Amino acid sequence: MGTPRAQHPPPPQLLFLILLSCPWIQGLPLKEEEILPEPGSETPTVASEALAELLHGALLRRGPEMGYLPGSDRDPTLATPPAGQTLAVPSLPRATEPGTGPLTTAVTPNGVRGAGPTAPELLTPPPGTTAPPPPSPASPGPPLGPEGGEEETTTTIITTTTVTTTVTSPVLCNNNISEGEGYVESPDLGSPVSRTLGLLDCTYSIHVYPGYGIEIQVQTLNLSQEEELLVLAGGGSPGLAPRLLANSSMLGEGQVLRSPTNRLLLHFQSPRVPRGGGFRIHYQAYLLSCGFPPRPAHGDVSVTDLHPGGTATFHCDSGYQLQGEETLICLNGTRPSWNGETPSCMASCGGTIHNATLGRIVSPEPGGAVGPNLTCRWVIEAAEGRRLHLHFERVSLDEDNDRLMVRSGGSPLSPVIYDSDMDDVPERGLISDAQSLYVELLSETPANPLLLSLRFEAFEEDRCFAPFLAHGNVTTTDPEYRPGALATFSCLPGYALEPPGPPNAIECVDPTEPHWNDTEPACKAMCGGELSEPAGVVLSPDWPQSYSPGQDCVWGVHVQEEKRILLQVEILNVREGDMLTLFDGDGPSARVLAQLRGPQPRRRLLSSGPDLTLQFQAPPGPPNPGLGQGFVLHFKEVPRNDTCPELPPPEWGWRTASHGDLIRGTVLTYQCEPGYELLGSDILTCQWDLSWSAAPPACQKIMTCADPGEIANGHRTASDAGFPVGSHVQYRCLPGYSLEGAAMLTCYSRDTGTPKWSDRVPKCALKYEPCLNPGVPENGYQTLYKHHYQAGESLRFFCYEGFELIGEVTITCVPGHPSQWTSQPPLCKVTQTTDPSRQLEGGNLALAILLPLGLVIVLGSGVYIYYTKLQGKSLFGFSGSHSYSPITVESDFSNPLYEAGDTREYEVSI
């Protein structure tokens, strides 16, 4: 081209003619045209620009399937780039190959195809982008020609440039989302972009602030069998691999899932073929929390808040010390966690307790850090002017290996006031003469478990010490326990005061040297007794300590006449050879309800009447160390009933009863709906004690497929040996065999019914060419006729009766290239010899039948002629004259249908 001339818009008449000719030029290749204006024509401003834009839109309509307007999208779901982003228009050659997105035509002035920053990128900017406004009609435009008043020539060049743009869906495929709440939708599979992309493989990564998790709810889910949607939690951090929460077979509309971390992934795959439906998922962030810290043994924990910033404070029971941090803080993070390990409560082996007021001394457990041998020394010091009272709560020492000594003072040289080798355990306890006590425990590999719990209390010298009653309660008239105060004792259920009977109260006496006028009673679990309360407890002798051998205890439990007794076995751990027998009635002569031995789990028993008898027998003999803890039985009265408790039908299932009323012996049979399996016993029986033989079962949805099995001449690889929903089984054949059928089977769930495999199990067939059917021999036939036979298959031939087979009866297809039969097909020939007994067959048999038949016909015809022609008599023997003349052969009737002498033919078959 030469020197560019000044450009003027084309005259409106020419543009209008070109616009009218668009239907004829539609589909033709675009090319540049020079349009020269008529001399003396004026330069239109706004009207010519509008017509140019109309022309531009008409040129865009290159086919009926691509009806785009300038700067618009055909599919409303394919949004334009976000605001602020620049859509580059590259310089392209005139002939461009089709791209993967919609084609947009841009008009650039001066023939510049998007090159340089001065060229506008699009004639009409897409929504959401910023572009310079069009020039106002009133504002002067830029100079169109050289300065100096030279004659200007206007040339308009329309350049059509094919621009490949990348468009995105509202929620982009492979997109990172950081908002706290929103929606994730599947891309439109019917859009032009999706049709050209082929297989869609999209990953939506949702991440929120640390300390928050992500909760999703499936609002719409309509996927085909070929489409897959995976929900994964985690990922995005080193060492934190994503964990599968669910796949498309496990998801359902309305389902809610929570990610335990601040990141969640949605992985969607879809084939190229557009399908309806898709998915729509709502997501929102929720505040994560630390797990509840475990309670330490012999201690407890109190938590202010489980969310980040909350604290957990640990404390130990009396006699135990905390090992570790007393307070833990919930720290924020991808997964909030406590800032330390959970502490433990340990009994210390010795130590000094200053300013003692109230507390305990507990022996540590042998072994571990302290070793099998113990030497523990405690010093208990009270404040000035106070003394100490030591109460023996629980003591179990090995006579040969354990020793406990208590001294009134604070040194090993203080006077001994108790020695386990010489003294019995003081039920009243010990009182120090000074403000200190020295306690020493020695244990050398004991044969029996070591148990020691001593309760100490400091009290004023002008007052009595506070009485203590293990397994009981103490009420007093003076909480300060000054002289004159009364203390009354009562035991907890299952225990009895010892010594029994009144007085059950003691008094603080002697103002000069205050002391109690009697010893404190004790609450002990007794061996036997009569119990008539509506509810109570039966304990083994000396509970919670182990019972001693040589026990024979009988308890009688009685309630109101119209009631019966429900017995709950909470703890049962008796020695081998010991037995607890329950009698359904008053006395050991009643029917035996149950006999319990050794350790037993928790269970319930029901009497038939208002009386129940319990007998515990432990033969005398040396105790078995480590066993025989005892038992704890709770009882209460319940209404009398002659039926077992009503059991509701299971969810997703039903039950049938053998009787209308749930009386003794009634059998309940449980079944589940299709797609669910029964967890528990399917048959329950109402027992004699009106309790069911087992806990009611439940119906659980089956989430596994049946084992599809192995294949001959091949092997398989399973992603999960249990075949859960979503698992895959890959089949492969041995060398020389080819797979017929689907190579991979997928277990998918169904709304009704059990999970099912996506296809049938394939087969492994030989890779050799099949043998063609050799044909059927004349006068013979084959078994299982088909056109092709695989290598190794056999074909068998048979002949019809009267023919004999010449050749091989069975031929086999031998593998090869090509495969061949082992021999030629046989022939069927007529049998040479005939059995004499069958000589009448064929023509002889026909002659034997037709010859007698012909004789019968001849004789019958002769008799007929004889009677009718020769004798002139009727064959039927009618007699008498008639009132009409016989009709002769020459009748007056002219109708041939009534002509005499008609001929009839009879066909006789035998």
Swiss-Prot record:
Keywords: Cell membrane, Disulfide bond, Endoplasmic reticulum, Glycoprotein, Membrane, Repeat, Signal, Sushi, Transmembrane, Transmembrane helix
Compartment list: Cell membrane; Endoplasmic reticulum membrane
GO biological process: synapse maturation
Region annotation (O-glycosylated at one site) ranges: 41-48
GO cellular component: endoplasmic reticulum; endoplasmic reticulum membrane; neuronal cell body; plasma membrane
Annotated CUB domain residues: 173-286, 349-459, 527-638
Residues linked to a glycan: N176, N222, N247, N332, N355, N373, N473, N517, N641
Domain Sushi: 288-347, 462-525, 642-701, 703-766, 769-830
Ranges of the Cytoplasmic topological domain: 866-910
Region of interest (Disordered), residue spans: 65-152
Stretches that traverse the bilayer: 845-865
Induction summary: Increased expression in the majority of primary lung cancers and lung-cell lines tested.
Topology class, membrane: Single-pass type I membrane protein
Pfam families, per the entry: CUB, Sushi
Intrachain S-S bonds: C173-C202, C290-C330, C316-C345, C349-C376, C464-C508, C491-C523, C527-C553, C644-C686, C672-C699, C705-C747, C733-C764, C771-C813, C799-C828
Major subcellular location class: membrane
Domain of life from the UniProt record: Eukaryota
Topological domain spans for side Extracellular: 28-844
Signal peptide limits: 1-27
Biased composition (Pro residues): 123-145
Function: May contribute to specialized endoplasmic reticulum functions in neurons.
Family, as annotated: Belongs to the SEZ6 family.
Protein name in UniProt: Seizure 6-like protein 2
Organism of this sequence: Homo sapiens
